[in-house]
Amino acid sequence: MNFKTPIQALSPGSTPTKIEMCPAARANGKIWIDLDNSPHVPFFVPIIEELQKRNYSVVVTARDCFQVRELADFFHLNYKLIGHHSGKGKLRKVAGLCFRALQLIPTILREKPDLAVSHCSRSQLIASTLCKVQSFFLGDYEFATPWVFIYPTWHMRPEVIPERTLPRSPSRNLKYPGIKEDVYVPRFVPDPSIRSQLGLQEQDVVVTMRPPAREAHYHNPQSDELFEAAVEFLCKRPELKIVVLPRNEKQAMWLRDRWPELFSNGKMRIPEKVVDGLNLIWHSDFVISGGGTMNREAASLNVPVYSIFRGKIGAVDQYLSKTGRLVLLHNAEDLQTKILPGRRERPSRPQDGHSAALSSIVEQMVATMESQHVRSGGMEVATERGTVGR
């Protein structure tokens, strides 16, 4: 089977609009966006659209790892595939980051971008620093440091992350309202056919599960133990059906080998083809995930969600936990006392909302491009949410 992990589409049930790179001749400047991980694709799709509406040329590169390529193809992005996942282990990761940075340099020399933009792409940060291209680095996990002694020109993060956790001066630290997922979740439109596509009955209580990211630098083996304990806890409830979203084919094979009886009796299933992750979350009764993006997507959709992530808890997840939108599970006992495995009352569609996060991020990028810093190192420019400058 050609396994693909489900994706987070913005408008399920319809073909995404093709997003082209703007031509080289440009009125307002050129922005280079690097897609380093799968969640970055749906995040940047509306940003690219907004930048192109403002007549900015956008060049897109992507790393061939996890589901980045599949997602970029789904959204019909015009991108150049550069580099791949380097595997587990600190030395291999560092070597892989540096090697991909070198692979990105020809794109910089050819395209001559005015600004390098990413969501935590360390390879892009290294390459742009070496080529003296100013960088706009977005991040929502304060414990993921950019690089030792290499910092972006501007760093933008959700406003719930405290200023004191960031390495740069206040004039270089920008912020936006809400969380990263608020950039694209407000555009989501539900497609009710998802349950029948997965062979689920309307009366089934559905839990969507996302295993921990074993290859991530922040991975804690306790997350794996908690995931297995959660499956054992849930499989004892006859009304529950478990939909699992593995991160890759290797993880899918491990799941089938670990719980063959649950797959054979239909208790647990992996989607056979690409499905819309947001749509699956919306039509689930609750979510249990070791991945931050799926947790926050569920929180944005007001779907009950339980986190089995056992790394350092960042400010965004702490904020969601304090506001009752995310439940943090610390041990197997929490499975018994905190999870409420029942049907939820699901409205016909999510609550409508305007993405203040999207407009804030785009306006800051535009202010950066309009300033003299990007192309000639000129004076500071004041923006509505702060000052962009040296």
Question: Across the structure, where does each feature detected by a protein language model lie?
Answer:
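A nucleotide-sugar donor-handling region in carbohydrate enzymes
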Residues: 10, 19, 156-223
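A short, glycine/small-residue-rich beta-strand->loop->alpha-helix junction that serves as a flexible
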Residues: 33-45, 216-218
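Conserved nucleotide-sugar phosphate-binding/catalytic loop shared by glycosyltransferases and other
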Residues: 35, 52-96
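Catalytic donor nucleotide-activated moiety binding site of glycosyltransferases and closely related
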Residues: 75-87, 232-271
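Donor nucleotide-activated moiety binding/catalytic core segment of transferases
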Residues: 100-104, 249-290
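Conserved nucleotide-diphosphate donor binding/catalytic pocket of glycan-assembly enzymes
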Residues: 114, 119-182
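A donor-sugar binding/catalytic signature common to diverse glycosyltransferases
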Residues: 115-122, 127, 137-138, 279-316
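Leloir-type glycosyltransferase catalytic cores
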Residues: 170-201, 323-390
